[in-house]
């Protein structure tokens, strides 16, 4: 969907339900290189997505907790392109539902490369050195409101935009981070050599090898 936003001189392609109506693995990969945009008090804050993780409820062992929560399970099984703000270790994490209705799935936005409004982001992060290289950090840097949960994209103050496609050779595919179940599934995507990813591929692979006893 191409729309005019007041912060653009030319039309941009804003991601909507059609983009997210695919499997979580497809959406997680396609989101690499896209932009996250937040308008805060008239200022545009933005970042290029450099890291994502896919979660597919029915066949994903890591989703054992949300299966017990009827509200979350219903949200993940509903229409694609809807915000799901997951809370972990007292921090909010940004997820977007995907796949067809009835197929519980989402994609976690793990890291961004800032492209606009960096000074304001640093204020929101209270001067922290690590700005958006982690799922909780980017939520804080963009002042994403947990009250937005269950609302469809795009919102007036928050949306995603298509970006330049990132070639396959520049995208790494690894296991996900910090899981106790489903940790062997290669459902994480990250831009190779990006200083903004939350964990280097070497660290992730080393951790996976140790947990496997290799």
Swiss-Prot record:
Enzyme kind, highest EC tier: hydrolase
SUPFAM superfamilies: FMT C-terminal domain-like
EC numbers for this chain: 3.2.2.-
Record's keyword annotation contains Magnesium: no
GO biological process, one term: base-excision repair
Keywords in alphabetical order: DNA damage, DNA repair, Hydrolase
Organism domain of life: Bacteria
CDD domains: AAG
Entry annotated with the keyword Transferase: no
GO molecular function: alkylbase DNA N-glycosylase activity; DNA binding
Annotated family: Belongs to the DNA glycosylase MPG family.
Name of protein: Putative 3-methyladenine DNA glycosylase
Organism (species): Gloeobacter violaceus (strain ATCC 29082 / PCC 7421)
Upper classification of the organism: Bacteria, Bacillati, Cyanobacteriota, Cyanophyceae, Gloeobacterales
